[in-house]
């Protein structure tokens, strides 16, 4: 319990700890959706982000995927970063294909390997409809990249990916639009046993998916897998499903209360407990639409939460996290999120927790 109290104290102290990672405002650009993070060697981190139009999308100029992906790398666990590099597949697609590319998740199963899990967007003023997702691999720490390989024949969006016992597991909502509105709009788990070269269907999540979107996964201390879904009709309660066999079967489903609401949830297990962060809802104006961070002891029940970035972000706060185990037995947690600066335009911020 002392370790959890330390975690809560650290979380409470993050509100003034944001550092600017990408200043899109300087160029009138924006950067939604793509926040893939991976540690591909001890202390070596890759962080993706999008470089997109600051004007497209009449509803919220800057809230779109019309552009390409870039990434930076760090050799000191996210303290300092090298110069940005363009992700080749996204640039080639932007120039020559009828779709753009986003990347919300990346993983690594061995040293210097990076597997970027990409979604493909047909709408030049937004994202949807989505095409089938693809994986793009690097075996030299992001110096060069291979060809894109289709992950499955289902159109949709990859919401999370984790590595367990050397295998990759990803969470896909099979829906070419945003919210699930049809019976066939289901969440699936896919598995790769060959470092992201191919994927096979592992299982299907249970329950009603009507009005659901987004998702996250975490492996708890007891080895159980928890998958989460966002319910747009109930932003105070985060849907969860628990499996003891990595998504083949499910033993429990329910909802976890989030006092400040949650949208696009991102969950991680850290020393002392669990963290959950995302936009603090936006379907109504009852509460602020800030960037919220919760802590908990079991990945199901959450504390009262705290805002770690305060600005009305109706289209902001897409986020991700990376937990790094350090040689001295401590952990460093990197959180990356889009932060608003004008209408639908966003910069990219970083937060670091030393646990």
Question: Model regions: which residues?
Answer:
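Asp-box/BNR beta-propeller blade signature and adjacent active/binding-site loops
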Residues: 2-355
């Amino acid at each position: 319990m002392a370790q959890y109290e330390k975690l809560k104290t650290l979380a409470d102290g993050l509100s003034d700890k944001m550092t600017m990672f990408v200043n899109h405002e300087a160029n009138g650009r924006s950067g939604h959706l793509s926040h893939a993070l991976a540690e591909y060697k001890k202390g070596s981190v890759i962080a993706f982000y999008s470089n997109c139009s600051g004007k497209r999308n009449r509803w919220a100029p800057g809230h779109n995927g019309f552009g390409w992906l870039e990434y930076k790398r760090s050799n000191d666990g996210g303290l300092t970063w090298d110069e940005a590099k363009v992700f080749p597949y996204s640039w080639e697609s932007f120039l020559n294909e009828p779709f753009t590319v986003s990347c919300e998740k990346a993983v690594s199963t061995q040293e210097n390997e990076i597997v970027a899990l990409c979604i493909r967007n047909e709408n030049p003023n937004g994202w949807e409809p989505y095409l089938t997702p693809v994986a793009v691999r690097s075996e030299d720490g992001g110096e060069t990249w291979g060809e894109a390989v289709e992950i499955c024949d289902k159109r949709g969006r990859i919401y999370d990916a984790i590595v367990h016992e050397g295998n990759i597991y990803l969470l896909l909502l099979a829906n070419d639009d945003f919210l699930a509105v049809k019976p066939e709009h289901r969440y699936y788990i896919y598995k790769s046993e060959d470092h992201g070269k191919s994927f096979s269907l592992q299982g299907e999540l249970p329950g009603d998916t009507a009005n659901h979107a987004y998702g996250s996964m975490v492996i708890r201390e007891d080895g159980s897998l928890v998958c989460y879904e966002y319910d747009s009709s109930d932003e105070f309660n985060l849907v969860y499903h628990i499996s003891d066999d990595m998504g083949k079967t499910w033993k429990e489903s329910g909802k976890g209360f989030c006092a400040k609401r949650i949208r696009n949830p991102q969950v991680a297990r850290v020393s002392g407990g669990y963290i959950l962060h995302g936009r603090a809802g936006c379907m109504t104006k009852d509460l602020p639409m800030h960037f919220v961070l919760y802590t908990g002891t079991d990945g199901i029940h959450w504390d009262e939460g705290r805002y770690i970035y305060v600005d009305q972000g109706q289209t902001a706060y897409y986020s991700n996290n990376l937990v790094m185990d350090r040689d001295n037995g401590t952990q460093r947690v990197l959180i990356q999120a889009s932060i608003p600066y004008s209408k639908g335009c966003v910069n990219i911020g970083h937060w670091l927790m030393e646990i």
